[in-house]
């Protein structure tokens, strides 16, 4: 047994699995960048009050799942449990909302929630997110959703579905809240659930306990009580999704786990993951900017789970990314050859080729085994006789064929064989 291991619920990604992880993260990010979303890098931890106010004190995230601690200055800070609140804080702090709108940003990285670890549910989770802030336009809602859909499909994932609903606006939510509370207070709920019903009754509909879900099965749904404006907004979003060819299922009982969502709300679900079927989701948050001290601007965004997307691909028997660490592997047969190959490797790397080489006293057989394990397409075999002749052996590791190439022509030959 090793002396140290990763903390419970915190996964390591090591080769070759790490190549698939990186490919998933890159594929999801690239879909956002192609739609004009610029990269933003955020702190891993923030002032605890940012999440308490932004995410909602009645949510499980804030009340049960945050990693919160006092720093050496006795300030309460929290490892970020989600990305939107931090992005909104940065937009306000740096005045991005004073420029061209919408502000369109994308990001990726680790987020932290103290949950019971299981497949697809980690205490350190990896996400890709986008936020579009400053324009209340249903066409923008549809674009954000389409970006997520395109990201999943770019990876070859196809066994997922988009579930969507509307959580209404300020003109219809108060009346619905009263209606829902009247229904909930007529049930035989435990005291903690009744407390949540008083603070935010939608949270009760998000309860995962079977007995609570059974009791709330006939609860009124917000989709049946939308204002005219909220209904028109939702209908327009659906019309845009239809035009974009993005399939969806309307789920009137959907409740997201964060309090800031309004109007359009959505989730991507993959049934191959069992109980933890959500692979991403998001929605509109029209009051969050004002709530965090900024202008009264609307916003919409999503968070996609990199870990869960990788699990979903595996459930479909698919993989992405290459396990190969390099394109070319150097096999030196002497110390002098090692020096010359190091120079060749530098030239190839400058040309954009991934190059590794054998180190230590491996001998030819050991070095060639290392070349095979590396996943390289080409091996460069160099000995003292080759140096005297001014050549190097260029071996195709897929076919086994080998040719001698002049040292000055190696870069061009390798690029040609790699099809570049």
From Swiss-Prot:
Family (UniProt): Belongs to the class-II aminoacyl-tRNA synthetase family.
Coiled coil: none
This enzyme's EC code(s): 6.1.1.21
Gene: hisS
Name the UniProt record assigns to this protein: Histidine--tRNA ligase
Keywords from the named record: Aminoacyl-tRNA synthetase, ATP-binding, Cytoplasm, Ligase, Nucleotide-binding, Protein biosynthesis
Enzyme class: ligase
Keyword Lipid metabolism: no
Compartments where found: Cytoplasm
Any one of the GO BP annotations: histidyl-tRNA aminoacylation
Source taxon at top rank: Bacteria
Species per Swiss-Prot/TrEMBL record: Mycolicibacterium paratuberculosis (strain ATCC BAA-968 / K-10)
SUPFAM superfamilies: Class II aaRS ABD-related, Class II aaRS and biotin synthetases
Assembly information from the UniProt record: Homodimer.
GO cellular component: cytoplasm
Catalysed reactions listed for this entry: tRNA(His) + L-histidine + ATP = L-histidyl-tRNA(His) + AMP + diphosphate + H(+)
Molecular function GO labels: ATP binding; histidine-tRNA ligase activity
């Amino acid at each position: 047994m090793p002396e140290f291991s990763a903390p419970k619920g915190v996964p390591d990604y090591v080769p070759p699995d790490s190549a698939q992880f990186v490919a998933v993260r890159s594929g999801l990010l690239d879909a956002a960048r192609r739609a004009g979303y610029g990269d933003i890098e955020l702190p891993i931890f923030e002032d605890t009050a940012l999440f308490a106010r932004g995410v909602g004190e009645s949510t499980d995230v804030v009340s049960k799942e945050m990693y919160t601690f006092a720093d050496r200055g006795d300030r309460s800070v929290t490892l970020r449990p989600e990305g939107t609140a931090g992005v909104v804080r940065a937009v306000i702090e740096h005045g991005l909302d004073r420029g061209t709108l919408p502000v369109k940003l994308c990001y990726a990285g680790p987020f932290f929630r103290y949950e019971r670890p299981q497949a697809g549910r980690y205490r350190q989770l990896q996400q890709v997110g986008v936020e579009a802030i400053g324009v209340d336009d249903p066409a923008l809602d549809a674009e954000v959703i389409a970006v997520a859909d395109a990201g999943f499909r770019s990876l070859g994932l196809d066994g997922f579905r988009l579930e969507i609903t509307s959580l209404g606006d300020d003109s219809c939510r108060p009346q619905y809240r009263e209606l829902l509370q009247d229904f909930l207070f007529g049930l035989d709920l435990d005291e903690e659930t009744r407390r949540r019903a008083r603070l935010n009754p939608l949270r009760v509909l998000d309860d995962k306990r079977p007995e609570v879900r059974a009791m709330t099965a006939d609860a009124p749904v917000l989709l049946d009580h939308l204002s005219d404006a909220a209904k028109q907004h939702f209908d327009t979003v659906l019309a845009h999704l239809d035009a974009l060819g993005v399939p969806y299922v309307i789920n009137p009982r959907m409740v997201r786990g964060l309090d800031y969502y309004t109007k359009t709300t959505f989730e991507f679900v993959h049934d191959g993951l069992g109980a933890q079927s959500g692979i991403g989701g998001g929605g509109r948050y029209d009051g969050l900017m004002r709530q965090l001290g900024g202008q009264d601007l609307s916003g919409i965004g999503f968070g996609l789970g990199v870990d869960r997307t990788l699990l979903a691909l595996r459930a479909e028997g698919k993989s992405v990314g290459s396990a190969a660490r390099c394109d070319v592997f150097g096999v030196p047969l002497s110390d002098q050859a090692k020096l010359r190959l190091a120079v060749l490797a530098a030239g190839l790397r400058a040309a954009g080729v991934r190059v590794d080489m054998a180190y230590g006293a491996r001998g030819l057989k050991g070095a060639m085994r290392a070349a095979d394990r590396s996943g390289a397409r080409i091996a460069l075999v160099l000995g003292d006789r080759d140096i005297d002749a001014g050549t190097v052996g260029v071996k195709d590791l897929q076919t086994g064929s080998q040719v001698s190439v002049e040292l000055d022509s190696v870069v061009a030959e390798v690029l040609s064989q790699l099809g570049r």
